[in-house]
Structures are given as structure tokens and as C-alpha cells.
């Protein structure tokens, strides 16, 4: 994701803030599936929380903005932290999922 933030890899950016970038997932798990990433590299959500509560709050606020911009009546925000939780890209990120009924538990 560092290369996307740097503009070296194309992405469909839907929103941004000073500290975060939001772009569409290339393998969406829902009709709306957007990733919100911090602009600086932090490997996972726990690392982001430890490094900067303000940057974590910024990412969560941008996720809410994305949901509003997309007109989602309901949405889910997911952060997989660690390989055992399904994290496959080790740059902290939030998944914003919506556009259909989401069941629980997710998987």
C-alpha cells in the first residue's frame, strides 16, 4: 500500500485526508469495498494505535466519510491484525464494506 500512497501504483481513490487514503479494493467482498490506509507505513492496526491515536482516529473518520459518500445505510469496518486473523498485506488498513446485507459472524 505504500506504493499506492506514493502514486507508484494506480488505485481508484475515493477519499483522502491529511493522514489517510481511501481506495477501492481490487477483489471486493461486497458491492462497496473500500480500503482506508494510513499514509505512513505501519504494519497493522495495533501498531497504528500504539504509534498515533490521532492517525487511527483519522482513518476511522475517513471510513465513516466513505460510507456517507457512498450512501450506505449500514456498513461494516473490519481490520484484520496478524496473519492468523487473515491479514495479507502488512500495512495497516480498514475495510469498509456495504451495499448488501452483511451477516454475522463474518467467517
Q: Model-found features: residue ranges?
A:
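HIT superfamily nucleotide-processing domains
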Residues: 1-107
